[in-house]
């Protein structure tokens, strides 16, 4: 399994990972559901995501969506825009960056406003460069399920050395020692 970000919503959790991982992730997590009332739903094909990054990204978003934006690394907020929900997630890039996820209608309404505010589109090559510069490993490119978090510098984001029992705790503790 690759790195998964978990976002708390009002009545659910959203698990965000790289494309193509939903089936394996659901299968893996489903093994640990015993009595809880849990339903896993693959929403990979629901919505689109764009990245806005740069020194004025936060200020631009605040003015366009008329809402506060996440301050903490990997923080997120859910807002309404053009009558549709948008999820704004702070992403770790060398520049101030935010992932914006929503349906096609809301992103289509947001895109020209971003352009009017001076934002310009960048291609996948630049997004990939930002990812590499930020030291963010990509599952299937830089790592696979044979890598431990410490091997790809995920200690601070993916490991708790103080939390109680969890799967893999012994291996993680040995590497930390």
Where are these regions (language model features)?
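Basic, glycine/lysine-rich polyanion-binding surfaces/domains
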Residues: 1-177
């Amino acid at each position: 399994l690759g790195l998964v970000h978990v976002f708390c919503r009002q009545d659910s959790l959203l698990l965000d990972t790289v494309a193509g991982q939903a089936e394996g992730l659901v299968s893996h997590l489903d093994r640990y559901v015993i009595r809880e009332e849990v339903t896993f739903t693959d929403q990979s094909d629901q919505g689109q995501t764009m990245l806005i990054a740069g020194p004025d990204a936060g200020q631009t978003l605040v003015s366009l969506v008329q809402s506060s934006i996440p301050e903490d690394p990997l923080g997120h907020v859910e807002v309404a825009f053009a009558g549709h929900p948008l999820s704004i997630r702070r992403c770790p890039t060398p520049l101030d960056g935010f992932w914006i996820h929503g349906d096609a209608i809301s992103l289509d309404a947001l895109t020209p406003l971003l352009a009017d505010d001076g934002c310009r589109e960048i291609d996948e090559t630049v997004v990939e460069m930002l990812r590499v510069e930020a030291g963010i490993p990509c599952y299937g490119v830089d790592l696979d399920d044979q890598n431990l978090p410490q091997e790809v510098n995920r200690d601070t984001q993916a490991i708790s050395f103080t939390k109680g029992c969890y799967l893999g705790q012994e291996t993680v503790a040995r590497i930390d020692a």
